[in-house]
From Swiss-Prot:
Disruption phenotype: Dwarf, wide leaf and small grain phenotypes. Functions as a two-component phosphorelay mediators between cytokinin sensor histidine kinases and response regulators (B-type ARRs). Plays an important role in propagating cytokinin signal transduction through the multistep His-to-Asp phosphorelay. Functions as a positive regulator of the cytokinin signaling pathway. May play a regulatory role in salt and drought tolerance during plant development. The gene is AHP1. One of its GO terms (molecular function) is protein histidine kinase binding. The lineage of its organism: Eukaryota, Viridiplantae, Streptophyta, Embryophyta, Tracheophyta. This is Histidine-containing phosphotransfer protein 1.
Length: 147
């Protein structure tokens, strides 16, 4: 497929992610930091976010399965996820983390479990779209041979 068609697909995907509220302006700020000196900057940051997010969500599940939940520890993990979400512009995940932290402060296991399900769904939805975005970027780069 031609680079122009792939670029069009990529732009449509990213625009859709903004329209769905998955991303906010912070993602555009990230994109502006990418240039010829750091051509893989966005993909590196997004990959790190996806890896960290998956690790944190697994840890949150483990913590909330314990008979005596350490809500301060859970809150610390949610705070990490909120921070990394904010840094990549993952608006829905970040906003759900804000709700999650409120349940941690209330010491509500049920609230935390329900919000964990929501944050998991939103995170994996975003991760899948990020993976599609990165694949399109790789296909576009493959259209231009390196000298």
């Amino acid at each position: 497929m031609a680079a122009a068609a792939l670029t069009s697909q990529l732009n449509a995907l990213v625009n859709n992610m903004f329209a769905m509220g998955l991303l906010d302006d912070q993602f555009q700020q990230l994109q502006m930091l990418q240039d010829s000196t750091a051509p893989d900057f966005v993909s590196e940051v997004v990959t790190l976010f996806c890896d960290d997010g998956e690790r944190i969500i697994c840890e949150l599940s483990r913590q909330l399965e314990k008979p005596n939940v350490d809500f301060d520890r859970v809150d610390s993990y949610v705070h990490q996820l909120k921070g990394s979400s904010a840094s990549v512009g993952a608006q829905k995940v970040k906003n759900t983390c804000i709700q999650f932290r409120e349940f941690c402060q209330q010491r509500s296991r049920d609230g935390c479990l329900k919000t964990l399900d929501l944050v998991r769904t939103e995170f994996y939805d975003l991760r899948n779209k990020f993976q599609a975005m990165l694949q399109l970027e790789q296909q576009i780069q493959a259209c231009y041979p390196k000298h």
